[in-house]
Design a protein with these regions (language model features):
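Glycine-rich phosphate/dinucleotide-binding loop and adjoining beta-alpha-beta core of small-molecule
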Residues: 29, 175-177, 218-227, 232-398
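Short, surface-exposed acidic-centric catalytic microdomains
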Residues: 35-96
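Internal catalytic-core helix/loop-beta-alpha segment
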Residues: 75-126
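Generic structural signal for well-ordered alpha-helical scaffold segments
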Residues: 106-110, 129, 208-216, 329
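Phosphate/ribose-phosphate-bearing ligand recognition and processing surfaces
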Residues: 117, 139-157, 232-235, 312-313, ...
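Positively charged, low-complexity intrinsically disordered leader regions
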Residues: 171-221, 395-398
Length: 398
């Protein structure tokens, strides 16, 4: 009764479509809700499950802001908009819509190779069929609404219902790039609007995401030991620790230097933020001995190696990292799962040559693109399974 008592309000859309010349699937809602208009982006209500569904479809973390949401769409060749350009509506109630006027979908369809159209809910499907289908020439698949009001559909059911969206697009396969080209690519990403500190947060979150998945099904304590170096690879580890702690997984962050002693940026800022945010069950372990590291790893189900990154190209590893690597490898042989950030420490990401002391990982989460050393020479023996973390939309840049 309360909703019916509200007057109809005339709403103009105002949010531009997300697409580019690579978009192959067009996903359409009906009209932005008040929360979406407030957020100036699609599906802005915090309880709306649209972004959780897409993240689950592509096995990646849920995007946290509008830039990440647009990035996810473009990386997966998905265009996103709404059927209506304006209407009279009561709150967020599609059932109350009057005087609907459609968006000009040719803005998308004339520039992007869209092959399939999807509508997120029955109302969007009805308005598309009535107002847009004749002009577009493309019928729409009507998907269940991801709105929290559609409580009959659980998140797993929604993910399966939306799977045709993932099947309608061509996956992008990132190229193998030599380390100097990766450095240049990171600069190009920054110049395109995603600075290095943002990339680091995305990298650390993806690392934490993969570590949390690896813990699933393990029995016993869910505690993770994270080895953080002094550079930006270590920064990824600090961010991972921050997220894991936030998700309720205690971490022990092993570091040779306190966060305030670090000089590399954005690693220093990331470490300071992470250290300040850790809860009571987590801790920072500063400059431990090999014996103390052994005790930390005793019974630990999983460890993250974020000591040395893609810039390493030496025959030996300096102390104390060499000793920590030896202890970590012993723990690995005794059953601790090891996840490496970008490249196992002590392995050259360029040549695949391993130093005297090099981490043996079960999983390597490499950032942005694969590097040649992950598969060359000693690479396969040290990397384990390799997952590429798609932390930026790079297709126009490579």
């Amino acid at each position: 009764m309360k909703d019916c008592a509200q007057p109809l309000q005339h709403i103009e859309h105002g949010i531009p479509p997300v697409f580019d010349e690579r978009s192959e699937a067009l996903v359409l809602g009906t009209m932005p809700s008040p929360k979406s208009r407030e957020a100036a982006f699609f599906y802005g209500h915090p309880q709306n499950r649209f972004w959780r569904v897409l993240a689950a479809l592509f096995d990646e973390p849920v995007p946290e802001d509008n830039a990440e949401r647009a990035d996810l769409l473009l990386r997966h060749h998905i265009a996103l908009w709404d059927v209506l350009e304006s209407c009279d509506i009561r709150g967020a109630s599609d059932a109350s819509i009057a005087n609907p006027h459609p968006n000009d979908l040719s803005r998308v369809l004339e520039k992007a190779p869209v092959r399939r159209v999807f509508c997120t809910g029955a109302a969007a499907g009805r308005y598309y069929a009535r107002l847009c289908e004749a002009a577009s020439g493309l019928p729409a698949d009507v998907l269940p609404s991801p709105s929290p009001a559609n409580a009959a559909w659980s998140l797993p059911r929604l993910v399966e219902a939306y799977r045709p969206v993932a099947e309608a697009v061509t996956p992008f396969k990132p190229p193998v790039l030599e380390v100097p080209r990766v450095v240049a690519l990171e600069r190009a990403i920054a110049e395109a609007g995603t600075p290095l500190d943002v990339l680091m947060r995305r990298a650390g979150r993806f690392l934490a995401f993969e570590a949390r998945k690896a813990l699933e099904g393990m029995e016993g304590a869910k505690e993770i030991v994270i080895f953080c170096g002094n550079g930006n690879n270590g920064g990824d580890g600090w961010v991972a620790g921050e997220y894991l702690d936030r998700w309720g997984i205690p971490v022990r962050v092993v570091t040779a230097k306190a966060p305030e002693e670090l000089t590399a940026e954005p690693a220093r800022a990331a470490a300071l933020q992470a250290a300040a945010s850790l809860g009571e069950r987590s801790q920072v372990v500063l400059a431990p001995s090999n014996a103390e590291v052994t005790a930390l790893l005793d019974g630990a189900p999983l460890a993250i190696d974020a000591l040395l990154g893609t810039g390493f190209a030496h025959d030996t590893v300096k102390a104390p990292f060499d000793g920590w690597i030896r202890v970590l490898n012993v723990a690995h042989d005794q059953g601790t799962l090891v996840v490496a950030a970008d490249v196992p420490s002590g392995l050259s990401a360029q040549t695949g040559r391993a130093a005297k002391d090099a981490v043996r990982a079960d999983l390597t989460v490499t950032m942005i693109v694969p590097k040649p050393g992950l598969a060359a020479k000693d690479g396969a023996a040290h990397c384990g399974r390799v997952v590429v973390a798609p932390i930026a939309y790079i297709e126009p840049l490579v």
